[in-house]
Amino acid sequence: MEELQLQGYLEKDGSRQQNFLYPLIFQEYIYTLAHDHGLNSSIFDEPMEIVGLGYDNKSSSVLVKRLITRMYQQNSLIYSMNDFNQNRFVGHNNSFYSNFDSKMVSEGFAVIVEIPFSLRLVPSSEEIPKSQNLRSIHSIFPFLEDKLSYLNYVLDILIPYPIHLEILVQILQCWIQDVPSLHFLRLFLHEFHNWNNLITPTKSISVFSKENKRLFRILYNSYVSEYEFVFVFLRKQSYYLRSTSSRAFLERTHFYVKIEHLIDVCHNHFQKILWFFKDSFMHYVRYKGKAILASRGTYLLIKKWKCYLVNFWQYHFHFWSKPYRIHINPFSNYSFYFLGYISSVRINPSAVKNQMLENFYLVDTLTQKFDTIVPVIPLIGSLSKAKFCTILGHPISKPIWAELSDSDIIDRFGRICRNLSHYHSGSSKKQSLYRIKYILRLSCARTLARKHKSTVRNLLQRLGSGLLEEFFTEEEQVISPIFPKTTLFPLHGSHKERIWYLNIIRINDLANYLDWS
């Protein structure tokens, strides 16, 4: 019902889609949609208690109506930001700081902000229906395997957060022309933690990202989209700066002439001249806040790329990116964590015996191969954060699941185990997954024992030890989307066979915990 109301609102007039999003903030069905989205959260999310109100996180129509009434009363503040310090959006009782109000406002506003983005994506998804497999996360690894084996250096980049909140609002102006909605967003961001300083502490940004996940993802993705759009544009322009003469002096002259022409074109984006350089063997891959920039060039060239990125964030987004967030490493002796895998370029020496007439000689050859393995220690750390084990890897019970039925408990643990086996099927060393499966199996047994107020030994004697053992060691038949034939792929039978799936559209929750920790 709520989706039909929203669709009818958007179909009335095309101009209203962009210029009149603000009235949706006062519609109750928007917050119902936001609540329905929250019900589809990860199984690792814990139910939250609303501090000071005594309610759980279930949507209450009464509370939503009260929230909308308070926002109506404060409507005049949306248009007068000058008296921000004298007038408070929350009213006199500071109820806005409650978890319910802040979460519902942020989730509801995120639903509204997603409208312009979804309208742009619908036509493109209908035009290219055959590219669904490109959405798979695993499709990135065959690309890395094909390209990175021949490169020399890699930039391991942690994309910095924009410090000033006004930068995020200005970026959204390119997508949303509704001025009242932007003022409302600006007011909410500043009111959330009273961010009046130019430099916001990292801790505050971290708290905001955890308590308002959906809105934070919208803001962060819009910022990353803007950064990559400008970065890729400048990268393409620098790639076409080809020399037109064979002489070194003339090459240098023509190069700087083209540089000056490009600076005139990009003058609106930069306040200071940035030096461009040519690197035709550069590859860029990103997922969330982690990016990989690999090059076949020399150390001096990759160092220039690092300086360029630091200056890029400084002059285009007006904030300082700490240089230690960008690491330069050679592929020959470096492993980087990306998308839940520890990846590296492994050098395999081999000797070939050749014969010429009656003489034999050996030829030593070196081959480079892109390798991916399961990060056991980070996975144990993620299991520890999710309360499945201690930091040392000792299994513990999951108290919050003890109230479920036995079948639901086993199903949840089994689903986690199967998802891990499925997601890490591209590892060349799958034996390390046995330890993770052991932790989950024993944690499941202890959770069942906690529910029945018994010990693990007595529980297994009563229910039978073969129940969990048979469930967690079940072999699966896996059809590889890369190889033309169907193969049997038991987890314990093929330790070095790597299979990438084309139906995985999101990173595993345990690996996701590590990326955002």
From Swiss-Prot:
One of its GO terms (molecular function) is RNA binding. GO terms for biological process: mRNA processing; RNA splicing; tRNA processing. The keyword Chloroplast applies. InterPro entries: Domain_X, Maturase_MatK, Maturase_MatK_N. Pfam families: Intron_maturas2, MatK_N. GO terms for cellular component: chloroplast. Transmembrane segments: none annotated. It comes from the Eukaryota. PANTHER family: MATURASE K (PTHR34811:SF1). Belongs to the intron maturase 2 family. MatK subfamily. This is Maturase K. It comes from Trillium grandiflorum. The lineage of its organism: Eukaryota, Viridiplantae, Streptophyta, Embryophyta, Tracheophyta.
